[in-house]
């Protein structure tokens, strides 16, 4: 059996999803506080910095209980992929997406007002 992996989503496709009639996904940003100070995603997100997983780990099942698809975001798409893999190991029924290229791709392809760092 193949291991579960998050589905890749490009920045422009995520933008379309957030603007169309489909229910919005739950956005989870795994970047650190200092990174959020540099560049914020222009939508509501859950902030789960990986370095402080002890602060949010226990609440994950509650926060994901509504069954919405989850899109995980980081700077370049690597840390978010790792969290996405972990989420699918814990809750294989979830629909998990990874923003390819992270917020950097969002800045390059969707919204240049989001600073690059």
Residue ranges of each PLM-predicted region?
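Rhodanese-like catalytic fold shared by cysteine-dependent sulfurtransferases
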Residues: 1-25, 33-69, 78-117
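Short, surface-exposed ligand- or partner-binding patches at beta-edge/loop junctions that are enriched
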Residues: 73
């Amino acid at each position: 059996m193949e291991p579960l992996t998050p589905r890749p989503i490009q920045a422009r496709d995520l933008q379309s999803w957030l603007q169309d009639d489909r229910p919005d996904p739950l956005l989870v940003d795994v970047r650190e506080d200092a990174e959020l100070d540099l560049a914020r995603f222009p939508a509501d997100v859950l902030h789960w910095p990986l370095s402080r997983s002890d602060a949010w780990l226990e609440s994950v099942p509650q926060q994901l209980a509504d069954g919405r698809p989850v899109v995980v975001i980081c700077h370049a798409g690597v840390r978010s992929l790792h969290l996405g893999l972990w989420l699918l190991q814990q809750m294989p029924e979830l629909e998990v997406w990874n923003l390819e290229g992270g917020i950097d791709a969002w800045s390059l392809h969707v919204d240049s007002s989001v600073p690059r760092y």
